[in-house]
């Protein structure tokens, strides 16, 4: 285990903004995590677990211990009907999806190129193109950070919702995801109802065809974090009431929306685009010109630049549509998690 003091976080989050933390530890075993929690030097400090740092913005120096998950390994067993995968939490998610497809295991291909680690996937209940992690997840293994004992949670225990789970609520900061279990059906059924996947000819449909198309679309629309700092989709797609949608669609007949939970889920990228915000910048932070849902670090921006840009976008969408955008990216201040509303209120 490596432990660094007053460490730079620039290489540990995909926004690539220069920021620091008091301590940074890179762990490759559960015992490493237990030893950190038992170390008197760290017990009173705020702690934050990171995978690839692909969904986080450090708004200032983090005055605590950042723990980077590098628990690696995966195994496959099978039943008559399913492939059963056990995946360590530090495994790279895009590499896992590509490996599954190459091995002939379908069902996961819609989730190609979502940045991050396997251990982060259930926290966010990652999803794309009509598939969410909850559709594939059979269990999540966690380390209880109070008892320092491991346990297995069923998918039902995880209380998955839209970009949501029990790990953001009742179990927030109370456990560390060590591994996940995935169940991929041997009898493959395509999920091709969304966007560009509908254009794949029926006789060409396969896990690999969907995987290739998803990768193609993502690479065309989404900037590579290795080249342009970003955290993927910055805002969640908001869910509004049917009445609100009916009022809006009378004025905006081309509004992009889908039925969801007795309401309508509106495409946040469409809302931002319709406000004329593609390409707009605040210093070195920019709304991506190709995909308005992504905020990028195009010129050594500061966290303050990203916060100001996010605030501008949120306000513009509210003024035009009376829809409140909620950021999907986690904001971290000196002591732990915060949000845009709290930052705005303090200014």
From Swiss-Prot:
It holds the Pfam family FAD_binding_4. Its EC number is 1.3.1.98. The active site is at residues 163, 233, 328. It catalyses: UDP-N-acetyl-alpha-D-muramate + NADP(+) = UDP-N-acetyl-3-O-(1-carboxyvinyl)-alpha-D-glucosamine + NADPH + H(+). One of its GO terms (biological process) is cell wall organization. One of its GO terms (molecular function) is FAD binding. The keyword Flavoprotein applies. Cell wall formation. This is UDP-N-acetylenolpyruvoylglucosamine reductase.
């Amino acid at each position: 285990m490596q432990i660094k003091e007053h460490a730079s976080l620039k290489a540990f989050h995909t926004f690539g903004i220069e920021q620091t933390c008091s301590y940074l530890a890179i762990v490759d075993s559960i015992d490493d995590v237990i030893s950190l929690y038992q170390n008197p030097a760290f017990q009173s400090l705020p702690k934050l677990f990171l995978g690839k740092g692909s969904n986080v913005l450090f708004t200032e120096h983090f005055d605590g211990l950042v723990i980077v998950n590098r628990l690696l390994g995966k195994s496959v067993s099978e039943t008559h009907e399913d492939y059963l995968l056990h995946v360590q939490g530090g495994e790279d998610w895009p590499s896992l999806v590509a490996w599954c497809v190459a091995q002939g295991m379908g069902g996961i291909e819609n989730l190609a190129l979502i940045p991050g680690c396997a251990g982060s996937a259930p926290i966010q209940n990652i999803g794309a193109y009509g598939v969410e992690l909850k559709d594939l997840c059979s269990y999540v293994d966690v380390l209880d950070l109070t008892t320092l004992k491991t346990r297995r949670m069923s998918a039902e225990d995880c209380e998955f919702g839209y970009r949501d789970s029990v790990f953001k609520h009742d179990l927030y900061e109370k456990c560390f995801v060590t591994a996940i279990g995935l169940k991929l059906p041997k009898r493959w059924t395509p999920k091709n109802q969304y966007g560009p996947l509908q254009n794949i000819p029926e006789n060409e449909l396969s896990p690999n065809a969907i995987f290739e198309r998803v990768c193609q679309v993502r690479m065309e629309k989404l900037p590579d974090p290795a080249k342009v700092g970003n955290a993927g989709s910055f805002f969640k797609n908001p869910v509004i009431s049917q009445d609100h949608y009916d009022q809006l669609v009378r004025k905006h007949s081309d509004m992009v929306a889908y039925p969801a939970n007795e309401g309508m889920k509106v495409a946040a990228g469409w809302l931002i685009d319709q406000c004329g915000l593609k390409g707009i910048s605040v210093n070195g932070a920019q709304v991506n010109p190709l995909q308005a849902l992504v905020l990028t670090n195009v010129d050594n921006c500061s966290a303050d630049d990203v916060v100001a840009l996010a605030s501008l976008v949120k306000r513009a969408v509210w003024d035009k549509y009376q829809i409140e955008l909620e950021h999907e990216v986690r904001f971290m201040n000196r002591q732990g998690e915060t949000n845009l509303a709290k930052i705005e209120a303090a200014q």
